[in-house]
Amino acid sequence: VYKRQFPDANNHYNCPIVTSYSENIKNNVEEITSGQMRFLNPFMAFTNEEVLSKQLVDCFKKEFHIPEAEVRDAVSEGWKELAMTRLEMQKKGEEVLKYMEEHHRRGIVLAGRPYHVDPEINHGIPEMITSYGMCVLTEDSISHLGNLERPLIVMDQWMYHSRLYSAANYVKTRDDLDLIQLNSFGCGLDAVTTDCVSDILTNSGKIYTCLKIDEVNNLGAARIRIRSLLAAIRVKEKKHEKREIKPANYERVIFTEEMRKDYTIICPQMSPIHFELLVPAFRAAGYNLVIPDVPSRECVDVGLKYVNNDACYPSLIVIGQIMSAVMSGKYDLSKTAILISQTGGGCRATNYIGFIRRALTKAGHPDIPVISINMVGLEKNPGFKLTPSLIQHGLYALEFGDIFMRCLYRVRPYEKVPGSANALHEKWKKRVIDFVGNTKILSHRKYRKMCRQIIRDFDNLPMTDEKKPRVGVVGEILVKFLPAANNYIVDLLESEGAEAVVPDLTDFLLYCCYNQNFKADYLGATAKSKRINNMLIRFFEWLRKDARDELAKSKHFEPTAYIQDLAKQAEHIVSCGNQTGEGWFLTGEMLELIAQGATNIVCAQPFACLPNHIVGKGVIKEIRHEYPGANIVAIDYDPGASEVNQLNRIKLMLSTAQKNLKKTNS
């Protein structure tokens, strides 16, 4: 994280790729992996000078035996120089603005990422703009002048984005300033910023221009766009149009106590085997929750219509489901709300709520309330509360879903009687729905008994003795669990003669809790947050204890891993500072699957989910180096992905898996 510059912003994260791309270097450069070169990439926070000093003292004292006092003095000098540099930049921005006023010049704020200052990347765009007689400023040089009205429609959680929004807000107040945003291919976070910056400017009558640049050194298209902008500005000047400067803040619709009584709450599907149990749990608490059943192709098509197409593939699926349901005509939209979860982390998933609100506004339904379900206090609604009863019902449902998934996927490929595994699942599903759908406080004794009985019944299901390759499925959480997003990969693997192994959904929640340990130890988070989250982990493990013990005693199942063990397995390949997206947890899952004998792994990599490319695809080389028998394939999922290409790559992995299995058996 950065030092907080804007107190009203939601958070102050750094870019997820800036925080983690060094891991790709560490795990893929031969000179480093072979030990020829020393490579240090400690995770550090620029929250304040003390937090930064502590990390650098630990690093340089351990690696180079530099005295603590010397390191702290160096950090202090660097911190002062950083503040001075920023101040000089702001003064220069004010000088340029004054020059524009005195010489009646126009200015262009060239807003981009820090690397866009590099001539090799911007291809000379600043010089081209000045050749037209205009001044060029960076967003950093004027962001301190923009008194941005908050809250925004987006989650303002990345520090660099906060500067972009503030700079755009200042530009809208001046007739002699315009803004051009530079956007590089693959920068998925700019799917959030480009929309928000555009809104800030266009709502106040300004023209928004975005230039997409990549490694191609051809400025023809950029020159045309800039000349078009200048022509449009001249036309507006001749018309002497008066602009109304509008505030940038967004007033969200609150979900009230009255709404709770008769509103239908639409929640997007993520994991059918879990969510079909969560629905009755929420209804028992008085919420009319519905999960729309939307075909996969329709999800994508509708998502592309309502979401910035540079956004990640999971966001298209989520918003596509919601908007398909909203536009279906099945619901009274005057009594409809949307429910979405937010982790509060640096992943763009925290901004899905902004995507949803923008899509609803675009479709003409801005009055539909969007409810955030989160544990970090991001948004609150009087009509939706996580009561102890709802938490109990929901967690029981989640744990039952994990048991069903673990048991069903393990026995179904080997069932002696076709359909018997699904029939057993349906039988127990009805009992679980009746149990978690009870409006009273649930019996923990009965819950424990049901967990044990489910595992025993699946363990005793008649199974064949054949051996099939076990294939783990990991990746981004939605693509991993949602069949519509992963093209029904579990069904595909089973039809091709393999057994699918999908890690528990609860593990992701434990990963979110465990992250507080690293944050408290190295990134300046409070010891209190660490204690609270470790208590939550112990609570989750208490809930899972009976299931874990029964799985350990069974003939066919492995017990669930402890989150601490996953972290220990992962941290020799990636740092536990990787906490964006699935972070170190994704690497840990792959290593745990290999330890359990599922050496064949499909790693689902959705479009624009760049952090997962670092901790997923980016660690495959190192995992193969440590485990030569690992058979891992990374499968890309995006709106235009060819299912044939995905199928071919999976079949190639399976053919290798079958060969390896024959060698093992022989």
Where are the regions that the model predicts?
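An N-terminal assembly and electron-transfer interface module characteristic of large anaerobic redox
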Residues: 1-666
